[in-house]
Amino acid sequence: MSILVIILILPILFGEVPPVNSGRVVDLNRNVRTDDHPTDLYPLYECGKQDTAVPISSWYGACRGSCSITRNTTDNTMEIFFRNDSVGWIDVLSLQTSPIRKNSHVTWYGECEKSSDVSSARPAPSEIIDTVAPAILDKMDTWPYGGAVFIYDTIDFPECKYTSDYSRSGWRIMVSKRSLELKSDISGEGYIIDPDLGFYFPISKGKGLGRFWWIWQQNSLSQQGCYFKTAGVVNCTLLLDTYTYSCPGINVAFSARIGNHLTSSCVGEVNISTDGITYKLHNQVSVGSISNQLISLWHQSEEALIQQLIIVINDALGKIESSYCESTCDLTEIAMSKHSDHPLVIETPVGPWLPASKGGEFVVIPCQSEPNLVVMTPIETCLSPFLIKVKSLKTGEVYWWMPTESHVSPDRQCLGHEEEELYLKSTQRKPLQFEFWKGAYIIDYPYNGSGRWIMNPGGFIHRSSKWFPSLTELSYTAPISLPTITEGVDKKVHQVIMSVGDIGNTTGSXWFAWMQPLGDKLARAVGSVASSLLIWWTTLEEEVKHGVIIVFFTVIGLIIAVPTLKMLLKGRRPYEPVKSPVVWGGPR
């Protein structure tokens, strides 16, 4: 047993670290391709959203705690889950409410006159929505999606009586139907997002107030998938000093403090840590420190030489702990604290982390090494900024990836300003430059041919020392060649050129071609305003419509009459008195 332990430990002390080549570990047993074009154009890491970030101080405590070999730990077998953010779609109704007053009056001729006064739109009280929601939702299935609007009044006209006039006050509700994406929060609670203001509405509430009210049927929700998906069953170590779980197998570290406990989720009973990790604990075993385990071997050994060697190994491991692991935590904290517009993922003893800034505070976002990220084919690119679409074979999630970065994140989005960017570049006759972390792909003006690749000798993706047991070697699922990427870039540029026009022509035609997308957007905006005005007009009573028409034509008449009158007055010749000779009646 002692000999076996020595055989296992000596390579750690005296073995060589695998060399790092262009951001990935080289397999020494394989021939590595060394052509001029990089083949490892995949992102290396998958990082969370900014709301998963933690302060650097929290990360530092976990990092230093993971370095200790002299403290007792607890090993756990647990199943880690990631959140299945989108779980389906749900039909909702938007309710735009306005106060309304309905009147009845008997004329001198005995006729019953009815009129309505509708005020400007404002949200109705919650109890009004609770009262009318069942009646409105009963008709949901018969209404089409889209811009159709249905009018629902909470009151009827009062009866006409000769004795006096009568009035009633209530609400006019304009209803439209649409479908919104159904999402899940970290605890498995379904919710939707207000498309106008971004408010979160829990499904269990049945309604939500944004710019106007939203309502939906709770009993019609179909179970379209589980809120959680498993990331695998892994072995994690409980670091008692920082009360943190460290899971080297999936490069994840998280708080052991339970923020929420779910007893009946779609995956059974699970815990949610205070930093948002969902997990299920299978078993727990208390394990002594590494140094205590080595000392226990000393008592089992009969040979003095082996006993002495175990003591030396114990001391050597202690020195490695202080000189490598803890110093790495210190240096990494310094690197993370330096602000950068293009931060890189940094591997640490507690997994890979991405430095970021949140609310003026330096934070770190948890990441995981992910060799299952592949570039989608056919190649799909975005030119503003330059992004490539990739997909995770493990989760099915799709991301926009900036090739100058080593990671992907759900926060990265395509802005969609390709036409404007391409036109501005063409006016200056500048080449299009698409940057990768090892170089750049250049397409020269007028962008009607293939590009050229220029290498960037200084470009690299940071990868720290690989001696930590938590850092596993990355192997790529399928190598990607640069020509495959650049063909997709060429195709995208040519598509944008076709929509912009002949930008190589110096005449004004290119200008009008570039303006065409803006003209289309303006036309859509005008059409939207016109449809809104039409809907508003249909909600008015006849008396109000007559008043609006009279005011409109009065204003138009004044606009035409005033300039005309001024022009007529200016056209008349000015009055001048007739000059007559002066006749004196007296002596001269």
Swiss-Prot record:
Glycosylated by host. Glycosylation is crucial for glycoprotein export at the cell surface. It is found in: Virion membrane. It comes from the Viruses. Residues 1-22 form the signal peptide. Keywords: Glycoprotein, Host-virus interaction, Membrane, Signal, Transmembrane, Transmembrane helix, Viral attachment to host cell, Viral envelope protein, Virion, Virus entry into host cell. Residues 23-547 are virion surface. This is Glycoprotein. It comes from Taro vein chlorosis virus. The lineage of its organism: Viruses, Riboviria, Orthornavirae, Negarnaviricota, Haploviricotina.
